[in-house]
Amino acid sequence: MSEILEDAIKSKAWPFEEAKKILDSLNGKTPEKGYVLFETGYGPSGLPHIGTFGENARMVMVQKAFEQLSNIKTKLICFSDDMDGLRKVPSNIPNPEMVAGYMDMPLTSIPDPFGECESYGHYMNAKLRSFLDKFGFEYEFYSSTEMYKAGMFDEMLIRVLEKYDEIMELMLPTFREERKATYSPFMPICPKTGKVLQVPIHKWDAKLGTITYKDENGETIEVPVTKGHCKLQWKPDFSMRWAALKVDYEMYGKDHLANGRLYSEICRILGGKPPVQLCYELFLDENGEKISKSKGNSISVDDWLKYAPVESMALFMYQNPTRAKRLFFDVIPKNVDEYITFNQKYHLEEDRTKRFANPVYHIHHGNVPKIETFGITYSLLLNLTSVCNPSDKSVLWGFISRYEPKAMPNNSPYLDHLAEFAIRYYNDFVKAHKSYLAPSEKHKAILQDILDMLKGLPEQIEAESIQKGIYDIGMKAGYENLRDYFKDLYQILLGQSDGPRLGTFIKLYGISETMKLIEEKL
């Protein structure tokens, strides 16, 4: 065994931990189908949100970790539940009145309200695929509609008929009395209306491959369960897919957690082997509510990428997948700066075990680019933007180049992009919410002390020396907690309650410019 493989096996990074579970479930052997199958699912009832990206990003992290631990081939599929009936009209789509006329119709049978694709479902699928393609995910796309209609699930659907009673024994105890009376694993597609029906099944015949039910007019209808004439309820459908496709690894959100045992049991009843599963926590919006595609109460992928590099979004997805996290615009600067820190640590680290534990290793699948920001963070750029209110990034570069003469847009593309992102973020989220503190007499005395200290400093002084000077003034200012001292300075000078290390900020902004800023406050 190579040293690299030994270090990967010893790694406690969660993608390696998940990969080891998969390898153990296979006893280290290649499955009969010749590859290990990773599956992600997508419900195209609304526009793809950042959680959809997150599931695929995390899945690929595990897939790549597995490939490092073994020589077994892998495949990733993205499965779209586009045959589901529409249950409610999303609030963030055009022509909602038109869509409302197609309730309970399969998503691929509803006209596209955007007017671009052959159906609502096709449009949503195209949106998903476009951003998966944009980020270089290697996957195969599976459509529920196409799979059902092409007969790819026919064998398993007949088996559901054969095991009907066993499946019902598992399912019925999970429902209230009124639902027990109407539940069936099968949902026929009405031959007259095309709707996905949730109706009681009065007869089922595994030999004929049919079910019998009464439609809304009381007419007895017999339909085959094959070739797209029926689809399964979502819980049995999940299990059937695992058995039919021989899925080896699946992730799902906490809203599925209570059903994990059911999925696995039904999969076994159908003759399949349940995959290794990871249940991840759901993202919450700024109010602590679950984000939703149909509500549109989340940050979209496009939103994030308007203000930050994709690596920062991938870092957000990597961190603590089993812990609930609030997802709103305030998290963007923090994740950009954390990515910069992790990237720098990775390239300074010689211990391979520690490199394997670094999030950037998994974000970039072991091929981590080296970025250079010359000690300038996204937060620092936001604060610089706050005081100089630039019309474009060239203004910021004037300060950056003076701070670090080696830094130029052409040799620091990452920093160049950050400057552009910072201006956008400041204009959209910070500018309107700035609230300056009017300095008291005590504050004015402190500001005068800082001004006097700065007057005696050369422009080439180190940021740490400036920081020490400000710190020493704070120690003499009579604050019980120095945190309150710095908070007051941030509110007076920057109009916000927190901020950067002032020494670094002053070095970047310039001593003379900072003196002018302080004089304005006096």
From Swiss-Prot:
PROSITE patterns: AA_TRNA_LIGASE_I. Keywords: Aminoacyl-tRNA synthetase, ATP-binding, Cytoplasm, Ligase, Nucleotide-binding, Protein biosynthesis. It comes from the Bacteria. A motif ('HIGH' region) lies at residues 44-52. Its main location: cytoplasm. GO terms for biological process: lysyl-tRNA aminoacylation. GO terms for molecular function: ATP binding; lysine-tRNA ligase activity; tRNA binding. GO terms for cellular component: cytoplasm. Belongs to the class-I aminoacyl-tRNA synthetase family. This is Lysine--tRNA ligase. It comes from Rickettsia bellii (strain OSU 85-389).
